[in-house]
Amino acid sequence: MDFPSQSEKKKYITKKRTTLFSYDDDDDDDDFDQNREFIHMSSYEESKDQQNSFNTLLLSELSNCEDQKQQQQQQSSSPTQSDCDSSPTNNNNNNNTNNNIVHHLNNSNSIPISGSNNNNNNNNNNNNNNNNNNNNNNNSHHHHLRKGRRLFHDDNDDQPIYPASASLSSTKTNMFPSSPILYSSPSSQQQQQQQQQQSQSQQTNEFKVPSFTPLSFINNSSTNSMNIRPINNNRIYNNLNNNNNNNNNNNNNINNINNNNINNINNNYNNNNNNEEDQIFSSSLPTSPVSWSANGSMMNGHNINNITGNHSRFLSNGSYNKGNTFPSTEVKRVRPDQRAFNENSFSMSPTPSPPPTPSLKRNNYSSPKFEPVFIRLAEERTNRKRSTSMTSNVNNNNNNNANNNNVNNNNNNNNGPNSISSLIANVNPFTEEGRLQSLNKPCPSFQLVNNNNNNNNASNNNNDNNNNNNNNNNNNNNNDDTCNNNNNNSQNIDNNLITKFSLYKHTFQELDLIGEGSFGHVYKVRHRIDGCLYAIKKTKKPLKGQKDRDIVLREVYGLSAIKDHTNIVRYFNAWEEDSHIFIQMEHCNGGNIYKWVTEHIKQSESNLLLLAKQILTGIVYIHSLGLVHLDIKPENIYIIYKCNQNQIITNNNNTCSINNSSNGSDSYFKSKIKTTENDLDNFITTTNSVNNNNCNNNNNNNVDNQNNNNQNNYLIIDGNKINFNSITFKIGDLGLLNEATNTKIYSEGDSRYLSRELLHDDMSALKKSDIFSLGCTLYELARCKPLPKSGMEWDSIRNGILSFEKEDSIYDDNKNDFSTEFWQLIKSMIHPDPSVRPSAEQLLEHPLIKYGVIEIDDFENEIETLKNLLAEKEKVLIIQKEKQKLRQNQLQQKMQQPNFIELKQQPQQQQEKQQMLHQQKQQYLEQHNNNNDNNNNEFDESEKEYQIQLEQFKIQKMQFQLQQEQLQYQHQHKHQNFFTKQICTASQIEGGIKNMAL
């Protein structure tokens, strides 16, 4: 073909190639049509008559087909005037002129958007479209048709250059159901001014496009703002970008997610007549009939009707206006791998592809954390894969009043981490507290927030929604509630993003503050799932560095290494949260024993020895692991007890309530006990608040008196009489745990319980330091007075001296209550020389610790047990004596019987043997008579000798038989047939006389 000359080319305004273009596979024919002819840049009439491109012809054919289709529908349906007036869709379709020509708008870089405020303008401007087209072509820089996949571009240097893929509601996107939808680029300041001018003067002939609001300003936008969201998820984010205006005629079913069929969502859009939305269209159209048939059929009348649900509502709601058509520049459908994105758009493709040009970037959209969950649920319920197409319908509608009420009511139920405190914590029925609760009625404090009221409110709001949604089914209304419940978190997205997830608050219910120390706070908590009680340590200050973290983690390492022991506080879990370390441990319901000192609760010697025995058992286990505690003191020794009904202290002829052991509940279980002198049968449990102050005061006086004179083997805790044998003492607070062979100590313990060698940095005997600390603890409990932190008394304790003379009257009274063996035991434990101090194993073998203080009852019990042992031994001796007598009688009978063996061939040998046997028997009898005390041993020896003799006799007998056999053999050879009979007397044991054949 003939290409135009250089002079002719000046008439044509060619497209400047910049980085903002998107090219296809054949860039050489971008400036040519199907006939390889250069596209002329004249007005639209000239281009129509001379050089019409293939796509322009297709557009005109499609519009004609659509017009014919509409005329057929009007003739078949013939709606009334009232129906037409009530339907904005019919009005728009009837008033639109057959403008099937794409045109350029003057000074516009984006494609018109048909929103809620543009429907009226569409009808007014339809008559002026042709005039605008003819007048503006001369001013436009690009009036030729492009075949390649390029975006709209303006070469004007005065305005910013960007791809103008806008959201269009006026284009015929129902014919291109598979065209990906692109988002418009951010509007410049110049475009925003044009938008304001357009809103002020709507009667001008210049049709300007309102630019969309960026994503960052969506929350502050007006009713014309656009929601930039993917198509499959715009209903999920409806409440996130919810506007303030309320339309009573709007359907809440826009927010529905139908679990059974995704097509119900599209049907809801067809029923929504007043939902005027900003529709997002693609600026690219198909280039061939094959690409138009997205549903697998060729371009015909049937294919136009077979449109997807997302595009079908464009014709029904009147947003499709034939007057607002594309500009004269040809646009093509962008493939999924060539999709263009601007700065405020993001891809929903599972495998994102690179952008078509270097200047177009895909920003990482920071979606909320719950977005993938809702997306996945919606896709799983509909059994559909995530679509790679961007044909999205962004919902910019305002919810009605009923929907807003639902949001407010549901926000009270689901506030994320803020509502954790209202969750119900279970009570384990297998624990002691659970058993007590099964007997008693639940306490009012356990009746936490009930969600029935909120559910009723939700049902009432659901009824309101049914009244407002006249065009929807009841099933869709049920979906409203489910979707609203899912979107409540999106309504409070700011609070959820600010409030961090707390494992401590989510897993445990905080009940009380147990204690506070240098480490931090210790809380009594209940696990929300298993219902058990735990003690959780939390660092007081946030960890500032690795050094602080290492110091705190030493206790965690120690607890995890020790695992589980009866006399050591059990460790469960540890975690770090907000620069705080949390340690979950076993809850000890009796607290620590330091309150014995502060409250002057005196303990007997037997109780302290029982305490020392259990603590030494735990120390032995720690030392067996090659570790040392280095912080043994009353504050770190805890009590676990079990309270039974028989252990409750009561007063005669009084009726009062006493607190049972509460394993960490908010309030103790109350019980009324009516007692007599010998009766505790009438036990009535109640949960009402008790106001028996007078009875409690009288009872407390008795408790104090019993505690101050606690010489018996029991302990009074919370009004309960606890037997010391049922109490378990545990070692806790392993923050200073260290290796026994380590010469470096990170921190020292309490100076009141430190040994002298540790004060002088002597780390050679760290195990003996624990013994010194335990000795100081027993000394403090015996005195019932706190140890000094400095002074002469402090120094005397380091020297192993107990200064009895300098003590006050309280200590003098305690001195007489303990034995000298007890004080000697304490002195040995606090000896200044660590090599002299006994080890933990040796102390467990000490008689005073092993057996404790023996009382009169213990002596009587011991005597009874000894008598029983003696009686059993006497019975055994009598039986043995009777057996010995029977054996002696049998032997005498055997000796009295004659034991002669007559052998004619060897008479002399037999006589000698008989004499020897007779002599041995006589000797045996003489020895037996002389040694009556050793009858058993001598009898055994005589039996052994007798057996030896019998064996010798048997051997001789065998030899004799062999000789006889030889003689018989010789006699047979000599043919001498005679027999000799030899009669011999057998021994007394063999059973008498035997005849032998020779």
UniProtKB/Swiss-Prot annotation:
Residues 140-150 have a biased composition (Basic residues). Residues 166-177, 316-328 have a biased composition (Polar residues). It is an enzyme of class 2 (transferase). PROSITE patterns: PROTEIN_KINASE_ATP, PROTEIN_KINASE_DOM, PROTEIN_KINASE_ST. Residues 330-340 have a biased composition (Basic and acidic residues). GO terms for cellular component: cytoplasm; nucleus. Its EC number is 2.7.11.1. The active site is at D631 (proton acceptor). It holds the Pfam family Pkinase. ATP binds at I514, G515, E516, G517, S518, F519, G520, H521, V522, K537. It catalyses: L-seryl-[protein] + ATP = O-phospho-L-seryl-[protein] + ADP + H(+); L-threonyl-[protein] + ATP = O-phospho-L-threonyl-[protein] + ADP + H(+). Residues 23-32 have a biased composition (Acidic residues). Residues 70-139, 184-203, 265-274, 393-415, 450-489 have a biased composition (Low complexity). Belongs to the protein kinase superfamily. Ser/Thr protein kinase family. WEE1 subfamily. This is Probable protein kinase DDB_G0277539.
